[in-house]
């Protein structure tokens, strides 16, 4: 018969064994979760590399290219919108060019018709004015034409970074009217035609909307613009679910800076492509997420933007305090430089 000390000793061993089992189980769980996370991270990086360098470009025949189909592009007179029009025409789409400056639209129309031998038509409208007649005119422009592609490119931002409380009512309303109201109204006008034409031509329809890193990351000193683009992300993803049963693909395209009048950046770099390079990557990546690995119906197509998006999303997080603070400092610096430049110009005029 064992002593009490022997019984206590064995009880202690059993307790240690039980604890070791629990500790080992926790360690294995942690290891498994870490391994899965690391594997997912590496596979996503490989996916980004393949999608930006190796995989073939998307085919546009399924949207009616070279079959008489039309693509409607808003904000088509300059920058990214102009490149969408040119590159869609090069793929065999007839194009409908909608923007404010008629002279630029007519010049682009002649260039497209001469270079790509497709039909091009123009409509000059001011999306900054919320007028129902604008959307009636767009409906009449489309008429009986087989429009299967809509590119929502039109957009505006703040003239310079500014705090929300100092943003003028005119600028605030202008941003919401162009970025949100106009985009929704154009889509509500054109998407039913896209659905009907896709069914009639036995092809798919496409609705592309230009988003921004300003909507991906809450951006201090661009609060209204940032909110307007974040709205488009949620709206576009919801619309994708609604139009999928109608054989219409919906995707929002996210970009960081691109050389353009809106960004006020003139020199291209590895992180800041030209509109031509950005649109080329967008059209090549259609239907893929590239840098937007965890976001439905979303694409961050340009290679450096894709890496930037993916790393932010998987490290500090797009809604983190750190990302917000970095964004604030970045745009505060831009504001200081813009104000100094304005002061110099004012001084030069007085002289």
UniProtKB/Swiss-Prot annotation:
Gene Ontology cellular component terms for the protein in this record: endoplasmic reticulum; endoplasmic reticulum membrane
Listed pathway(s): Lipid metabolism; fatty acid biosynthesis
Keywords of this entry: Endoplasmic reticulum, Fatty acid biosynthesis, Fatty acid metabolism, Lipid biosynthesis, Lipid metabolism, Membrane, NADP, Oxidoreductase, Transmembrane, Transmembrane helix
Biological processes annotated in GO: fatty acid elongation; sphingolipid biosynthetic process; very long-chain fatty acid biosynthetic process
Keyword Ribosomal protein recorded: no
InterPro entries: 3_ketoreductase_fungal (IPR027533), NAD(P)-bd_dom_sf (IPR036291), Sc_DH/Rdtase_CS (IPR020904), SDR_fam (IPR002347)
UniProt subcellular location: Endoplasmic reticulum membrane
HAMAP family, per the entry: 3_ketoreductase
Family the UniProt entry places it in: Belongs to the short-chain dehydrogenases/reductases (SDR) family.
Organism annotation: Eremothecium gossypii (strain ATCC 10895 / CBS 109.51 / FGSC 9923 / NRRL Y-1056)
Name listed for the protein in its UniProt record: Very-long-chain 3-oxoacyl-CoA reductase
Catalytic activity field: a very-long-chain (3R)-3-hydroxyacyl-CoA + NADP(+) = a very-long-chain 3-oxoacyl-CoA + NADPH + H(+)
GO molecular function, one term: very-long-chain 3-oxoacyl-CoA reductase activity
């Amino acid at each position: 018969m064992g002593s009490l000390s022997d019984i206590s000793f064995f009880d202690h061993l059993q307790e240690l064994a039980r604890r070791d089992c629990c500790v080992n189980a926790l360690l294995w769980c942690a290891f498994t979760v870490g391994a899965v996370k690391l594997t997912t991270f590496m596979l996503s990086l490989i996916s980004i590399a393949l999608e930006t360098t190796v995989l073939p470009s998307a085919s546009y025949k399924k949207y009616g290219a070279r079959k008489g189909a039309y693509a409607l592009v808003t904000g088509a007179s300059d920058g990214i919108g102009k490149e969408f029009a040119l590159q869609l025409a090069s793929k065999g789409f007839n194009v409908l060019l909608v923007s404010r400056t008629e002279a630029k639209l007519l010049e682009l129309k002649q260039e497209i018709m001469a270079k790509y031998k497709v039909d091009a038509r123009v409509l000059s409208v001011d999306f900054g004015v919320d007028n129902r007649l604008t959307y009636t005119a767009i409906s009449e422009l489309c008429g009986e034409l087989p429009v299967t592609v809509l590119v929502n490119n039109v957009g505006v931002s703040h003239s310079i970074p500014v705090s929300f409380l100092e943003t003028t009512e005119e600028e605030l309303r202008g941003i919401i009217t162009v970025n949100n109201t106009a985009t929704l109204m154009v889509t509500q006008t054109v998407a039913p035609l896209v659905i009907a034409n896709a069914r009639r031509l036995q092809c798919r329809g496409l609705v592309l909307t230009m988003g921004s890193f300003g909507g991906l990351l809450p951006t201090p000193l661009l609060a209204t613009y940032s909110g307007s683009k974040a709205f488009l992300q949620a709206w576009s993803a919801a619309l994708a679910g609604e139009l999928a049963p109608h054989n219409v693909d919906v995707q929002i395209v996210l970009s960081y800076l691109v050389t353009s009048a809106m960004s006020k950046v003139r020199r291209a770099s590895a992180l800041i492509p030209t509109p031509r390079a950005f649109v080329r990557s967008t059209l090549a990546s259609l239907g893929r997420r590239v840098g937007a690995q965890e976001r439905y119906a979303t694409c961050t197509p340009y290679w450096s933007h894709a890496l930037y998006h993916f790393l932010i999303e998987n490290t500090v997080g797009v809604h983190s305090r750190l990302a917000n603070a970095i964004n604030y400092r970045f745009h505060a610096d831009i504001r200081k430089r813009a104000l100094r430049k304005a002061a110099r110009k004012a001084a030069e005029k007085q002289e």
